[in-house]
From Swiss-Prot:
Belongs to the Casparian strip membrane proteins (CASP) family. This is CASP-like protein 2B2. It comes from Arabidopsis thaliana. Keywords: Cell membrane, Membrane, Transmembrane, Transmembrane helix. Residues 1-28, 93-108, 188-201 are cytoplasmic.
Amino acid sequence: MSYLGVGVSPGNVSGSTTKMKLIDRKVRVTELILRCLVCVLALVAAILIATDVQVREIFMIQKKAKFTDMKALVLLVVVNGIAAGYSLVQAVRCVVGLMKGRVLFSKPLAWAIFFGDQAVAYLCVAGVAAAAQSAAFAKLGEPELQWMKICNMYGKFCNQVGEGIASALFACIGMVLISCISAFGVFRLYGGSKSRPSSRW
């Protein structure tokens, strides 16, 4: 039996192999597209937030709002920088693999990619969650703690931060999808190990 549960015989071995290669290639192309999207979206998010500055004059005193004033935004910029760099490296790996016609990897490499994708996905989720909570306080305030609505004073700053968080959210969703693909790839390695001990990813 093959690892798809199909009976192996001289008549269907070549057909099933060709079909699996086709599926693998489609998965890798999808992975490449997602990694490129994550790289672009994460980079856009980091740039939008890192370059966001607004100066207001209050009682003859200039007050400047910048992303470093909120630690959650600093975290989001760092996380998106990591996600963009990591996605770029992995996208290059995907391109090289597709150009060489190799879509299968060794188990250690597959596990390394899996753990890397999981780590970056969790970082993205944590960064977006922290930034969204801080943005909510800035937008709505907290009367019980006497926290004022910062966005009433720094509208442009808040709007640009919102755009950055939205871009980071889409990058986060893309990273979660990529981590699912890498998880599928890793666990599929062991699906055929019993019936095809000589095959390697």
